[in-house]
Structure formats: C-alpha cells, structure tokens
C-alpha cells in the first residue's frame, strides 16, 4: 500500500526553530524561574514541557486576588496577647472597669481590625472582645468588616470572628426592631443617617456573598458562616443543642463563658426577625441551589462539608416556610426525592436507602424524618422502613435514624415496631448499642405502650443474677479496674458506660418491671459497690434517679437509704457523691428518723464540710444551720411542712384575728377616721 509523501527532517527542523528562540541557557533558566514564581499553577508550568502544545485562549490562574491585610508588629502582638489574657482571667473589680478596658482595646485596635481577625495569635482576642461588647461597639466593628466579608468568611481565623459577630449581633436585631416600632407609634423623628441599623448591616454582608454561594457551600470555613446566616435570617435558636452541632464542630470553644459574659436568653429561643430577613432568606436559599442539578444535590448529601448546609436548608424550608412547601416541585425535598410513591427500585427509594448506612448522609435522613410532612413520613415508613426496622436497628449508623423514626410513630405503629426489634435486643446489648432500646422505652412511656415484653427481653439479655446484671449494664467491673490502676484518667468514661447509664435512667422512669430490674440490682450489690456507684460521675445519675423519681416505692427507699449510714460525710465531700446526698433529702421525706441520723453525721463533720466547696453546698441544701439553731423548724421542713407557722411567719395573717388584734384595728380606724373593721 503506498505511503503518504512526507518531508524528511521535519523533527530536526522543529528542534532548530525552538533553539533559535532562546539560545542562552541562563535566560531560559531565569525565565522558567520567573514563570514559576508568577504563576504557581501546575497546569500552566507544563507549557514548557511539550513543544507542540497549542495553548487555549485563556489566561493563567491568578492567585494574587486574595487580599493581604498586613501583619501586626511585635509590640502590637504583645499588647493584644496581654489584653486577651486579661479578658480571659476576668478579674475586673467592677463592670465599669471592664467596659473601660474593652473600649481602650477597641481604640488601640482602630484601623487594625482586619489584621487582628486574620492573625493566628490575636483572632481569639477579637472573639473575646465581641463577646463582651455593647451594641454600639458591635455596630462599629460590623461596619469595619463591610466590604471584606467574602474574604473573611473563607479565612481560617477570621471566619470564627465573623461567626461570633453574627451571633452577638443577632440578639440585638429583635430589640432594635421593637424600638423602631415604638418610635414609629410615638411619631418621633430620628436621624437615620447617624448610624446604620444591624438589620441593614446584615443585609449588606449577605449582598457581598451573593454570586458565590455555590462555591462557599462546600468551602471548609465559609460553610460554617452560611449555616449561621441561615439560622439568623430564619430567627431560629442559635444556642440550641440541636443546632449547635450543625453550626460548628464539637471542638469549637465557647469563649463567651471564659470572658464571663451572658448571652441574651432570646438567643436560645426562636426570635422575631424583620420582614426584610424573610425576603433575604428566600433569595439566599434559592440562590444556594439555583445552579445545582439534582445529581449534585444528592452528592452533597454525603459530602462532609456540604451535608450540614443541606440539613439546615431542609430544616428551614420545612419548618420556617410551612409544610406545604414540600409539595412544590422546585422545593429542596422534592428535588432530592422527586418520586411521590417511593415504589420499587426507583431513584428516590435507592437514594433514601443508601442514606441509612452512610455516616454522613444518615444525618440528612434524620432531618428529613424529623421535619417532613406527615403524609410523606407515613409513606416513607410504610414502604421503606416498617418491614426492615429490625435490621436497621442492628446497624450502628442506621440505628440513629431509627431513633428519629420511633419519635414520630403512633401507638399502634410503635407497638408493631417494638415487636420487630425485640429479637435484636440481645445482640444490641452484647454490642452495647443501646440507643434504640432507650428510645423504645422513652416513646413507650409517652404513648402508653406495654413495655413488659421489652423488660423480659432485657432480663434475658442481661441475665437473672441481679449483681451481674447491674455490673454488665453500668460496666462497673471496668470502672473498678481503672480506679485500682495507676492511670490518672479517673474522670473519663467509656461510651459503653455512658450508654448503659442512660438506659438505666430510662428504665427507672417506667413503672413496672423495667424499673424493678434496676432497683432490685441496686439493692443486691454490696455497700462498697453502692458507694463506688455514688462516686462515679456517670453512673451516679442512676442512683440519683432511683432515689427521687416517682417510680421509687417507699419500700425501696427505706431499704436503699439505710445502706448509706456512716457514709454520708464521705459522700458529701465528693464531687459526684454530694449530688447523691442531695438526692437523699427528698428520698427520706417520709423517713424522718433516717434523715435525722444523716443530719447528725453531717454535724459531726461540720468543719470538714465548711472547708469544702461541695461540702458547703450539701450543708446549705440540708439546712444544717437551722438544724443546729431551731431543731423544731428543721423538723417541720424535713416533714414537708413549709406552710407551717414556725417556718412561714406570713401564715399568721391567714388565722382568725384575736381580740387584741381586733382592738388594735378599731383604734387605728378611729385615728384615721374610717369605719370600724368587721
């Protein structure tokens, strides 16, 4: 077959042309080094590798766009570090002295706010300052950050300052809104140009981030700020335990408690927000998912950074915008789960089934179960969960979703679900996966379901011997070995011991065989074991509940309280045991002779108790000063006679007036010229 006619020596000619461009090797070396310095982009550096490379009509990536706000000098760093230490110690004599100090730090930081926020060593000072600032200082700092939020929220240290600023500014938005409405009612004129409202500052900050939501959604640091902004605009609680883990990680430090400032209680409750926030929230939520297709949205469900944002978007959509929003085909729930019937091996059914076993996606599924409309939840439970709830409860990850499902079941569905889970109780107990069992007990108490079969399953799993049962449930043998060893981690507890303690506390809240399982075990152990339980920071809660809950019978309290004779002073001086001593006060409400015996033990060790912080608390809670001075009054309190005349002097006014009282009243009436009292 004839070949194509080709020109000989073409490779050599191409090589000569390349060599003619730069003949000096030093120039080539210098040019390469400058290129690497100017464009630190690996794909752009590869332009020098191949001579036949045809570049596209695009510019290399520019990494010089991120602004640099400068560095603090050594003197400034020392000053701000010293100020941070003083704020953390919080040893100011008066609040006025503290406010003067904070204002001076603000004056020193004037013009350096962005440097401090981006500083690794001084950004913590900025957070502490914000936590202790007044509303005017927060506004001033907020105004300094305006125009830089897009860069600050992506910064490792400045992003924490932005979050702290948003949290503390949010608590003043509602108060400003109330003041504004009251001034409008009084028709008072106000110079609106003097100072921007926090409402306007928030809207300006959000406008800076617009157009970048898709990237910030999965950005390592900015995603935390997006979650917080969603809560602020929706007026949802910012310090609620259910939302704290979604906003920030568990390693997030609470600097407000160290500075000694108290947040407004409204920050932990649902807040009223301006109407402009509702409009901004709808636009923000729409823009966040506008450029994302359904496939990418489902990929976010298992993304470790994007998943928490998706959780909040779903929660706000379903709770803040109403359940009817779920019917909208453009809603986030319908984009994730477009199929209405969830039948067969459809795309939506496969997606939801996959979330059960995913450590990240299961959290999104918990949010769907909690906030989804009732019609959707019933269909979801009937088709995907009801027949498989036993196998789901076996899995460590899917078990958390099962707990959320149990919280929404009716009485009949809960009874059938318990029947499906009962065969799995023994394996769950063996692996110390007790969250599903605990949820079954708690929901059974609420719904009024008979928990006798569950008690029988737990008895079979833990054994008939009462001592070994409580040892296995609370992991007492392991804690005793740790206390006897040389390790110093006595205050740490294993997750198995914590889950066992929570299960025992849930069992004690149920009347009948469940509480009797724990009570009989506590009576069967030795006194030394009982004292060790009382002194354990985790397990002692079981003993406190056993003494104080309404399920505690008089017979049980009479038997268990007598075991503490001679040990009251020892427990009162212990950080955990002192709470058990406090619980013994209501536990002996109908056992006055036992309570007096315990009080005598406390009197004997009065000096040691007064020298101890926890001992002084026990002395005060047991009213021991009254016991020493007025024994009769103390006995009246011990019997529960708080309304007696010996304790409450105001009770005399409710008694019939004596003759001398009537005479005094008549004399006073004559002096005042009024009628005689009848």
Swiss-Prot record:
SMART domains per the record?
Pumilio
Chain intervals for the UniProt region annotation (Disordered): 1-24, 477-496
Highest taxon of the lineage = Eukaryota
Q: Name one GO biological process term.
A: endonucleolytic cleavage in ITS1 to separate SSU-rRNA from 5.8S rRNA and LSU-rRNA from tricistronic rRNA transcript (SSU-rRNA, 5.8S rRNA, LSU-rRNA)
Query: A single Pfam family, by name?
Result: PUF_NOP9
Record-level Gene Ontology MF annotations: RNA binding
Cite the entry's keywords alphabetically.
Answer: Nucleus, Repeat, Ribosome biogenesis, rRNA processing
Query: What InterPro entries does the database record attribute to this sequence?
Result: ARM-like, ARM-type_fold, NOP9, Pumilio_RNA-bd_rpt
Q: Which Gene3D superfamilies match?
A: Leucine-rich Repeat Variant
Residue ranges, compositional bias (Basic residues): 1-15
Q: Where are the Pumilio repeats?
A: 108-143, 291-334, 382-419, 524-562, 563-600
Question: Where does this polypeptide localize?
Answer: Nucleus, Nucleolus
> May I have one GO cellular component term?
90S preribosome
Give the family, as the similarity comment puts it: Belongs to the NOP9 family.
Q: So what does this one do?
A: RNA-binding nucleolar protein required for pre-rRNA processing. Involved in production of 18S rRNA and assembly of small ribosomal subunit.
Which named protein is this?
Nucleolar protein 9
User: Can you name the source organism?
Assistant: Paracoccidioides brasiliensis (strain Pb03)
The gene for this chain is: NOP9
